[in-house]
């Protein structure tokens, strides 16, 4: 006795369509748990800007997906704990040192990230700014994997002629392109400092009488 049940053409097509759809979903990985857990890299960039140079660099490094956070705003709100795949900081060099508020921020901050980078902007002299930041950040248990400087138009008007500065080709686009490529590939590198640059900073500190633990008390 034949117990097989005949199905209609409509039912057969329905079942066939379901089978094809299931196969397509499985092959595309939509049913994979791993695909559900995939996430895009998150980058946070903190910035301190006095004349706009550092904000410009921070925006260029941020691209479309990173989060830009103002250091003065974070200090004002008392926010110091952050976590991301990558954390960066951009600030201007004042007397070869970080601005006092940047120093305050890094000393209190708890930054959890697989990769940390810092880009320091300056207009004339950087001296041993990279080593100074490395010491300060390490002392605060916030060591950085990548530290670089980039020379910009020096727009601190009391000391420099803006028109003359604009005539000088400082290769900003080329330098920024290299820094961006380094950071995107997570290079581990600190810009080298010469002994001459260290001596220049020591001489500056002696002449200026600045407290090396404070630096310039300049606001953003």
Language model feature labels by segment:
Residues 40, 201-220:
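Ferredoxin-like iron-sulfur electron-transfer modules
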Residues 144-145, 186-194, 215:
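Short, structured loop/turn "capping" segments at alpha-beta junctions
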Residues 13-34:
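N-terminal export signals
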Residues 72-154:
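Helix-loop-strand module that forms the ligand-binding subsite of alpha/beta enzymes
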Residues 152-163:
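Acidic/polar active-site rim loop that often engages polyanionic ligands
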Residues 1-11, 35:
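N-terminal secretory signal peptides
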Residues 165-171:
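Conserved anion/nucleotide-ligand pocket segment
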Residues 28-50, 56-64:
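C-terminal segment of N-terminal export signals and the immediately downstream linker at the start
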